[in-house]
Amino acid sequence: MELQLRNAQGQTDGSVQVADAAFGDRFREALIHQVVVAYLAGARAGTRAQKTRAEVRGGGAKPWRQKGTGRARAGTIRSPIWVGGGRAFAARPQDHGQKVNKKMYRGALRSIFSELARQERLVVVESIGVDEPKTAKLAAQLEQLGVERPLIVADEVDQNLYLAARNLPGVDVRDVPGLDPVALVGAEQVVITVQALRQVEEWLS
């Protein structure tokens, strides 16, 4: 499979040959959905906790006597039906993580990259970066490439590139080990360097 290579001015400057094994897969919507849901589930803190009637402070004394008042009987002011009472089915901290096999995870990323390549949303460049942490310089580069709010995948994210991209809305910068399915699915376009492309190819082939 061939992908167009762009220069710094955004013009086509030859092409890059990539393996079909990494970028020629069919679109597997169900697999991508499963992996994205599992990834987001794993990102949940799972720390929420509520108190049952036994755990809420107070409520030890019977509010009024059992008989003779005309009111409904009550044994504690911390009953779940009372304001300020405990929860009937209190939430507990839990792990929301879902198991995803390595083959499934790689298969989902392969499918996403293949679809990006098919839709010409994968922009391959020789290199991307700035010599000083200036947002305007990076914005000018992206404008020349004709991309807006892209995910930038570099073989190495230096401090200047990170700082320059930080103030651009919708722009995200990652290296290859830092890629995840949510970032890829959410990206309008992906700008990737040749070196990073080779790393992805080796990883997913």
Swiss-Prot record:
Gene3D superfamilies: 3.40.1370.10
Transmembrane region(s): none
Keyword tRNA processing included in the entry's annotation: no
Location of region: Disordered: 51-70
Protein name per Swiss-Prot or TrEMBL: Large ribosomal subunit protein uL4
InterPro entries according to UniProt: Ribosomal_uL4 (IPR002136), Ribosomal_uL4-like (IPR013005), Ribosomal_uL4_dom_sf (IPR023574)
Entries under PANTHER family matching the protein: 50S RIBOSOMAL PROTEIN L4, LARGE RIBOSOMAL SUBUNIT PROTEIN UL4M
Keyword field: Ribonucleoprotein, Ribosomal protein, RNA-binding, rRNA-binding
Keyword Aminoacyl-tRNA synthetase part of the UniProt annotation: no
Function noted in UniProt: One of the primary rRNA binding proteins, this protein initially binds near the 5'-end of the 23S rRNA. It is important during the early stages of 50S assembly. It makes multiple contacts with different domains of the 23S rRNA in the assembled 50S subunit and ribosome.
Single GO BP term: translation
Subunit structure comment from the entry: Part of the 50S ribosomal subunit.
Gene Ontology cellular component list: ribonucleoprotein complex; ribosome
Covalent S-S links between cysteines: none
Family: Belongs to the universal ribosomal protein uL4 family.
MF GO annotations: rRNA binding; structural constituent of ribosome
Species annotation: Alkalilimnicola ehrlichii (strain ATCC BAA-1101 / DSM 17681 / MLHE-1)
Pfam families according to UniProt: Ribosomal_L4
